[in-house]
């Protein structure tokens, strides 16, 4: 299950509106395909990117903060592939986060469960 929350609040002194968008429990749903024949599109980080891009365009990039609450490294074929199959290339997860423009990403319990080898590659 993917969680998306949007908060808006006012900052005093010079009035400014900051939009905070958070994701969490993505569990490897980086792309909108489930890799199973006959299944349609699903909610993914690419869906979130489309929303965040439109929000950044509407209110200004500097007024949007994008955060992830962890649990991104397990649960999908793409995550499994980069965790355990193709371990000779840079892990895809940091590149996905950079592509989306995340401001901060924290580690969840399922991210640690992948093991030290995976965790070290993600942090390299």
What are these regions (language model features)?
Residues 1-2, 50:
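Accessible peptide chain termini
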Residues 2-3, 37:
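Generic low-polarity alpha-helical segments
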Residues 3-11:
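C-terminal segment of classical bacterial N-terminal signal peptides
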Residues 12-124:
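N-terminal catalytic scaffold of extracellular/periplasmic and nuclease hydrolases
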């Amino acid at each position: 299950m993917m969680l998306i929350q949007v908060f808006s609040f006012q900052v005093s002194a010079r009035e400014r509106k900051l939009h905070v968008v958070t994701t969490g429990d993505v569990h490897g749903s980086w792309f909108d395909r489930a890799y199973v024949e006959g299944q349609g599109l699903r909610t993914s980080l690419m869906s979130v990117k489309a929303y965040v891009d439109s929000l950044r365009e509407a209110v200004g990039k500097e007024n949007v903060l994008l955060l992830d609450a962890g649990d991104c490294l397990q649960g999908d074929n793409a995550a499994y592939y980069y965790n355990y199959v193709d371990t000779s290339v840079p892990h895809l997860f940091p590149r996905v986060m950079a592509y989306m423009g995340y401001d901060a990403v924290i580690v969840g319990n399922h991210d640690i469960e992948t093991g030290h080898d995976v965790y070290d590659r993600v942090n390299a």
